[in-house]
Structures are given as C-alpha cells and as structure tokens.
C-alpha cells in the first residue's frame, strides 16, 4: 500500500513535469512546478485516501493528452486521452472523475474560442470524430469496471445496512475457501 501511494505521488509529479514541459517552460521551472504539485498540501493531507491521490496522478496526463488531441487533431493523443480517462475513472474518486469531465468541457470551450460557435460549426466533424474516438477508447477500457458496477448496483443500499439474506448469500463459497491456503 505504501509503494502504491508513492507510485501515485511520483506519477503526479511526472505528469505535471510533462505538462509543464509541453508548454516550453525551462526544465528547472518544470521540475520545480512538478515537485510543488507532487508534494502539495492536498497530496500530503490526503495520502490516507488512495483514490484521491490517484486522481492527482492522472489528472495532468488527461489535461496534456486532451490539449494535444484538440490542438494537433492527432489520433495518437486521442487514444492517449481515452486511456488517461480510463485510468482516472478506474483509480480515482468518482466525484473527481465527474469534475474532470466538466473541466474538460470548459477546457474545450476555452481552446476553441474566441469564436467558439463559428469554430465548432466549421470544424464539427473533426471535433465529433475526436470525441467519439475518446469515448470509444474509454468505454472499451472501462467496460469491465462498468459491468462490475452494474452487477453490484442492486446490492448497494444507501443509508441502510445489507439485509441478512444478502450478507449470508454464498458466504462460504469454495473459491473463498482457497484464500485460507494462501
């Protein structure tokens, strides 16, 4: 668990370094910015919540790859964006993922402005292709997690505990006994 936490903290610094380096910051400034992001108060204070740390690890990669796929209209960065969103969805806190989607929406509007509507109307096919590719890559990678979530959704009860029947169903399955030998 400690190695995983350190891995996520390191990944947040590496992602921020690549993001800052892409915008042609001096390497020392990019290194300083990535160390500041990696060791910011949120990461240090939230180290006990691993999924929050995972969110900070993959957020710079999502922003960098999305920026590059919108500005360069490259299939490679579109696939990277879908995969980065998958990592964020699969590892981070769910609210962080939703906030990131809103952030990407505003980021898209900012990148395609000042003539937002005229730019969207004139290039709508390319933007639609980019976003459909991102969605397809994201869904293909996330499909096991989505199916697992949908299967476990009926078993979740908010505000009340699990009933006795649900708690005792398959309590001593043979596959669970195998964990005793490990």
Please place each PLM-identified region on the residue numbering:
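Membrane-embedded helix bundles of polyisoprenyl
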Residues: 4-6, 10-23, 27-114, 130-149
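Periplasmic/ER-lumenal interhelical loops and adjacent helix-loop junctions
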Residues: 127, 135-182
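Short, intrinsically disordered/low-complexity patches at protein termini
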Residues: 68, 122, 170-171
